[in-house]
Amino acid sequence: MALAAASGSLLLLLVAAAVRVLRGPSTTDPEALRATVVVGVEISRDTPIDADLQKEVSTRFGALRESFQALQPAVRLQVLVLPEDRLLREVQRRSRSGLAPDLLLVNSDAANQLHRQGLTEPWAVPSPETDQLDPAVIARVRFAPGEVFGLPQSLQPQLACFDRGRLERSPATLQELLRASSEGKRFGLTVDLLNLAWTLGALGALDSTADVLAGKPVTPLTRSRIAGWLLWLRSADLQQRITLTPSRRDLIRRFQAGEIDWITCRSSDITRLREALGSRLGLAPLPDGPAGPASPISRLRVLALGRDSSPAQRRAARALAAFAVNPQMQRALTLRTQELLPVNRNVPVPVESFQDLAALVAAQRQSEASPALEVLTQPKARFEDRANRILIRFHYGELDTTAAADALIETLRQGAAP
């Protein structure tokens, strides 16, 4: 499934919803499927629902739709864009009317949450679909023995996006970043725990943060490392040419407008940024730090089966999902978008031929090298909003370093509760 749209207000129906079961062209093929399949696509809460988003989703979905419908011309596909912060409520609301999506393309934590709420059906493991996927991504979606809560579809690593017209290359270390800032280059970061997670490893606070969230005892060393991380953020915020903002949307807008030269971004942002910067857009892994390598979080996009489908819709949805992860489609979508990484283990990424894909692979390797990140993305603890409020209060000076560290540790401890 190539709907790697951005991990707004209500949902946008990109193709007008029609009947749930369609008449389909006449055919004598006993294997032909006839159904209307509604596909729900989760987007980041910071992604504006506008004409640009519609174009992005249409472009990504077009290749998959055209190829799949060449095989199954009697399957009609409709796409719903579901904002991240309203995803669960919207699927619950539609499910009460029996109109929930037949297939969902969402982040793995959302897929887990939907499954725990009884809103999706599991996939069996092993199966022909899961057998061809990287075992590491299967491990991230395993729910119980013999089943996963969704079928992995693609990876969206976090990385650095920069303006080649202003920066010859992206800083390889935090020290280089600070030096470039002092020389007049402008940098932007989002005040958001998961978007700042890459600095936890670079500054030596990742293991401490993960330990607290895992319910381990809080030691003086734990507090010291988390406080040290906050001190670096405060120091960076005081730099004239380093911008910290709570709004990722605002950060991207300012980068597009040429007000900032370098930002942290997610691979799902690349299409929009290419539209604005063209060949000036540069991609690179995030900077390492004095205490270790960068530790960015890579989003795993997952295909989950809805529970309200008719038998015909379920067969068509499963066929579409299986088609989306086959080697040919995974390779085609990777090369076409150059903003997502395949999960099919039989699809090598041609990093020698494509500079942007090489940057994505390097960013993904950073994430895979930091196993402590896994606990930060577990859906059992939806602590992000509380943690982000603490970081924003710290950013605006309402909390000093000690108070912010104490509050953040308490929030992480509460997140560890079952």
Predicted regions and their residues:
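Hinge/lid segment of periplasmic solute-binding proteins
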Residues: 106-159, 169, 284
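Short, solvent-exposed loop/beta-turn-alpha elements that line the ligand-binding surface or hinge
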Residues: 125-133, 185-187, 207-228, 275, ...
